[in-house]
Structure formats: structure tokens, C-alpha cells
Amino acid sequence: MDYCIFPPEEMPEGTIDLPLSKSISNRVLILNALTGNRGRIERTAECDDTAVMLTALSQTSDEVNIGAAGTAMRFLTAYFAMQPGRTVTITGTERMCNRPIALLVDALRQCGASIEYVDKEGYPPLKIHGCRLTGGDITLPASVSSQYVSALLMTAPLMEHGLKLTLTDGIVSLPYIKMTLGLMKEWGVDSDFTDNVITVEPQLYTPVDFKVEADWSAASYWYEIEALSSGDLSLRGLSRNSLQGDSHVADFFTGLGVNSEWDGDVMELMPSPDLTPRITLDMSEQPDLAQTVVVTCAMLGLPFHITGLSTLKIKETDRLTALRDELRKLSFVIDIVDDNALEWEGARCPVDTSHPVVIDTYQDHRMAMAFAPVALYIPGLIIRNADVVTKSYPEYWDHLRSIGFTTKEVDADTLLNNI
């Protein structure tokens, strides 16, 4: 399904009830499962990734297909590794089976896990023979994915000797690790995080009742719309004292012309004339916001140098290349620097204006949602495979229409072939 998008006839206006946090939902489902599901989670995110996690944790079959859900692949690998007497093969999409997982598997093996590679060494599918994990002292490069760290931490209290985890090579997405430890604390588990060493002693989780907060990553797309339109938008469901590192979106967008102010439990977004002339950011702790910020900067004509993006190459797609290629369709010449940064100093290139702009999403939900607001500047912009947003934000298009955008279902290939 491809969407042709047209902007509101008037200034965008409305209050958005944001979806619940996917990151928190996936963690609390694992934590609750480790208590024997004796706690009560009021609601979880209603997106594909969390649905995959729910299904995998409830089924008893010996094969689990997690589709394109990278978080589920990593968390469930650790979870199933410590289910004695159960053997599970976990697989996913072709892209998922080309995303490396050796660092996590090696770490789990050091903890006593029995895991085999079904096809290619270092990549899913995995055949996991559940057993009691011993734990102990291990070292893990933390520069690739914080989800490896979180997967180990959530299972650590139930390991025979607990876990002393030394992180090397620089820690990416640190707020996600802190989120995991914070949620473990909610379930009664203590930990110590000193310098680059995390220690979790053997202990039991305590069942709790838990309410998941709204998703700050989802909020970022409304900040983008506010920045590009100077509309009148409000966001409901966010937490003031959030565990989510992406709550920094409010700080990032102050330099992009958006101020934020709480009114009770609603975050009001307000236009500001203050634009930072050149944006310089380290987004190593908020990589999921990178696409939104990069596209916003480009559309506002603000040169930028954004670092800390090394993990974007192993996301749903190679997001560095995808951003560079799709922004070039809009005339922006973006440079990838050392596979860790994106830079734009104002260079533009000619574009063919004889046909609609078609944005490829590469089966990446964040590509679709980061580029859709560009329709404010380019009416008739086409987003290919628009339904990919169900991975994290199924209501996205409905919410976009609720503030005046128009979406028309089209076939991008047919349109381009008829020109």
C-alpha cells in the first residue's frame, strides 16, 4: 500500500493520544514472564513488535517466527536460553536473518547457554536448548546494540551466580540500558552500575501491577510537524519523569523552532522563532530520533552535523544510506561520515520535477513516519509501503488525518510508469 499525502488546508491543529511505549512494553512482558506472569500489566503497545512478543511468550510450539522484530529476537534469545527442558528455534524475516547476533550468543554461551546457528554462523535462525544459566563475569562490547545488554540483564537475576557485566568499546543507547535497570527495580531486583560495570546478584523478581506510559519516539513525528508548520498541537499520555531516553526530543527541537510546555498531563507544542543556525548533535543515546531530526533539519534548511549514528546501519534497514538516498530525491546532498555521522552543509542537486516524489521506506517504519510530514512542503509526496508503520505506531495515518492531512491510496509504480 502506497500513500499520496496532501497537507491540511489550514494550520494543523489537534490533540494526539500517543501510542504506548514499545520499548517499555517489550521489557515488561519479559519481566512479567520471568515471574510466571503473576503480575498485571494494564495495557501494552498495540503494534506489530509487541504483538510478536506477546505471541512468542504465550505459545508452546518449538518454532518461533518473530518477523522483523529485532527487539524480540534479542530479548527472546536470552529468555528461551534459560527455560530448562524446552528447545526452540527462533527465526525471522530475510532481513532479520542477516542482522548479526553473535555478540549476544557468545555472551549467553559464556553464561552456560546452549545455542546453535541453524544456517549461517553468527546470524539467525537460532536453535536454543533451554537450561539453567550459571552467569558469572563476562565482557561485552557495548558499541553495537544496547539490546544485547538489556537481554542479558533481564535474565541475570535468575542465573545461578548472577552476572557481572563489563561493557567495553563505548556504550551506545545508554538510556535504554538505564530503562531496563529501572524496570527491573520496579520488579524488585537491585543492581549496581558503576563506571562501565553492571552487577546483578542472584535474586527473584517480585510480581507487580504496571501501567505503560506513552511513546516519546512516536512524539517526535509531531514535533517535526510542529517545526514544519507552526501548528497548534498537543500530545497526551507522556510521562514527565520518563525512563525513555527519547524524551530528549523536547530538548532537540528547541533549536528547531518548537517549545514544549506541560498543561496537566498534556504536552503542548508551540512554535518558536528561535532556530539554531547550524545543528550539531550527538545522538548516540537517542538513535531512533535521528531520522526525524535529520529530515526536519533538511526541510528547514539548517546545516547539520549529527554523530553517534553507528547503530543505524544494523536497524530495520541501513538508515544512514536510506536517509542519504531519499533526501537526495528532495535535492539535499547529505554526506555519511565514517559510518557514524550524517552531515549537510547546504549542498543541493537538481531533481526531476516532472513526476511525483516517491519515498522508499525499505520496510522501515521510521522512514515512513519521518518523511510523511514533508508533504507540508511537497504536496502529493508519495510514501511507498505506508503500512510499515504498524511495526510501532499503527494509528499513525489515522492520527495524521485527524489534524487535516489527506492520504490517498495509490500504486507508486503505476503512477511512475504512466508519466
Residue locations for each model-derived region?
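Structural preference for solvent-exposed beta-strand-turn elements
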Residues: M1-I419
